[in-house]
């Protein structure tokens, strides 16, 4: 099992190019199921989760082709023939986002059988809002033997437009219902919809495919169903979480880095907090030049739905707070059980205590290298950031979590001057 070994204490300097967003790529890949025509995607991130999704789509019958064998970021998906409307437990257990095939399969094939999902162990993340919304659109749904079994009644019928108010803001729920609604008969209104940029990116592709959607970027999406969608070309939005992760690395380790091919307009809450921490930033339309000298200042924050501070950046900013001057409180409101990185940061010499859904960090002048273990995707990124700021050698085990959401992070860090390597 791969590990990362690094010797900290070296400032980061140079340029880093941000990949396409994992959290946009996964629903966008599933959108190809809505049409029998080819969908061409560019800026697709080369990640384990993306490869898993491509494999799942191939099992369903999608023909996946790479025009350039040396470029995994450009792919053509052709779902002309759907062989199976089932997403098996073997495929779904490794990645929660597999649930995103449910809406498209149900909308196009009028039936779907999808295993209840797995993925990162950071909370329940129930799929009840997906089921509630699809039922409102006329689907008959049973949960049997660990599978969601959904069909329209009769199975020749399309889904029907409906007004749907989810009980909570759910990103994958919004995406599933949005995709299903594009092929429904009549108009669907999604109230309390997730406003994340990745949801907007999916909606932009669906519009290119012939969907009629208004309210993109707001919490009220109106979808006028059409009988058929067609093929389209689309470039996946840059990954705001990867960009934020590298900004946190500069804040913790020091140095000057130009973060290229990013979308600063999707990072407002992160930028505000990092400025508070003392990170100096010049911001352009698709780049951020970040520099840090000395220790960061401690910043308190709470996670919430977009456009507030993202839960997917909580662990990384906590690593910055671990070496910051002062004390901070970090409150997690999205997922329970998302402080598993705290005990690992403390192994490196951090002083962080947990009280309910709040972590209290007392910044220390320096961390000391140690062997630590990644527990989930963003936790692994926080341990890498802490290792870069620590004195001595740090080893991060179980980095398969990291590979699910970051494209060769250690190579990008090496180009910034970090002393880091992947070992077996």
Curated annotation (Swiss-Prot):
Pfam assignment, any one: EPSP_synthase
Active-site residues annotated for this sequence: 120
GO CC entries: cytoplasm
GO molecular function: UDP-N-acetylglucosamine 1-carboxyvinyltransferase activity
Annotated binding of phosphoenolpyruvate, by residue: 22-23
Enzyme Commission no: 2.5.1.7
Database matches in InterPro entries: Enolpyruvate_Tfrase_dom, Enolpyruvate_Tfrase_sf, MurA_subfamily, RNA3'P_cycl/enolpyr_Trfase_a/b, UDP_GlcNAc_COvinyl_MurA
Keywords: Cell cycle, Cell division, Cell shape, Cell wall biogenesis/degradation, Cytoplasm, Peptidoglycan synthesis, Pyruvate, Transferase
Pathway assignment: Cell wall biogenesis; peptidoglycan biosynthesis
Catalytic reaction annotation: phosphoenolpyruvate + UDP-N-acetyl-alpha-D-glucosamine = UDP-N-acetyl-3-O-(1-carboxyvinyl)-alpha-D-glucosamine + phosphate
Compartment(s) where it occurs, according to its Swiss-Prot or TrEMBL record: Cytoplasm
Modified positions (2-(S-cysteinyl)pyruvic acid O-phosphothioketal) in chain numbering: 120
Gene Ontology biological-process annotations: cell division; cell wall organization; peptidoglycan biosynthetic process; regulation of cell shape; UDP-N-acetylgalactosamine biosynthetic process
Binding sites annotated in the UniProt record for UDP-N-acetyl-alpha-D-glucosamine: 96, 125-129, 312, 334
PANTHER family: UDP-N-ACETYLGLUCOSAMINE 1-CARBOXYVINYLTRANSFERASE
NCBIfam families per the UniProt record, alphabetical: murA, PRK09369.1
Name of this chain's protein: UDP-N-acetylglucosamine 1-carboxyvinyltransferase
Protein encoded by which gene: murA
């Amino acid at each position: 099992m791969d590990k990362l070994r690094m010797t900290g204490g070296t400032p980061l300097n140079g340029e880093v190019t941000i990949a396409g967003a994992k959290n946009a790529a996964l629903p966008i890949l599933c959108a190809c199921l809505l049409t029998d025509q080819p969908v061409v995607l560019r800026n697709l991130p080369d990640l384990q989760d993306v490869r898993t999704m491509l494999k799942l789509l191939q099992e369903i019958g999608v023909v996946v082709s790479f025009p350039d064998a040396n470029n995994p970021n450009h792919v053509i998906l052709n779902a002309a023939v759907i062989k199976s409307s089932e997403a098996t437990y073997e495929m779904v257990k490794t990645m929660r986002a597999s649930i995103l095939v449910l809406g498209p399969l149900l909308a196009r094939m009028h039936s779907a059988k999808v295993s209840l999902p797995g993925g990162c162990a950071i909370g329940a993340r129930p799929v009840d809002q997906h089921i509630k919304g699809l039922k409102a659109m006329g689907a008959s749904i049973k949960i049997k033997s660990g599978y969601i079994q959904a069909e329209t009644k009769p199975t020749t019928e399309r889904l029907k437009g409906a007004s749907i108010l989810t009980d909570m803001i759910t990103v994958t729920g919004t995406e599933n219902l949005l995709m299903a609604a594009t092929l429904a008969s009549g108009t669907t209104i999604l109230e309390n919809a997730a406003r994340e940029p990745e949801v907007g990116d999916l909606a932009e592709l669906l519009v290119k495919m012939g969907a009629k959607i208004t309210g993109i970027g707001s919490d009220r999406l109106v979808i006028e169903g059409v009988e058929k969608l067609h093929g389209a070309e689309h470039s996946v939005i840059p990954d705001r979480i990867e960009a934020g992760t590298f900004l946190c690395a500069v804040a913790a380790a020091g140095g000057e880095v130009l973060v290229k091919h990013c979308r600063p307009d999707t990072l407002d809450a992160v930028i505000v907090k990092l400025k508070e921490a003392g990170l100096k930033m010049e911001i352009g339309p698709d780049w951020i030049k970040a520099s840090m000298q000395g220790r960061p200042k401690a910043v308190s924050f709470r996670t919430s739905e977009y456009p507030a501070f993202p839960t997917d950046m909580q662990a990384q900013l906590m690593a910055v707070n671990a070496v910051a001057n002062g004390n901070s409180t970090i409150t997690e409101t999205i997922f329970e059980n998302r402080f598993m990185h705290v005990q690992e940061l403390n192994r490196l010499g951090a002083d962080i205590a947990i009280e309910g859904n709040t972590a209290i960090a007392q910044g220390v002048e320096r961390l000391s290298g140690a062997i630590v273990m990644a527990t989930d995707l963003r936790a692994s990124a926080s341990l890498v950031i802490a290792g870069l700021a620590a004195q001595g050698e740090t080893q991060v085990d179980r980095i398969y979590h990291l590979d699910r959401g970051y494209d060769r992070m250690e190579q990008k860090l090496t180009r910034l001057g970090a002393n880091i390597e992947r070992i077996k």
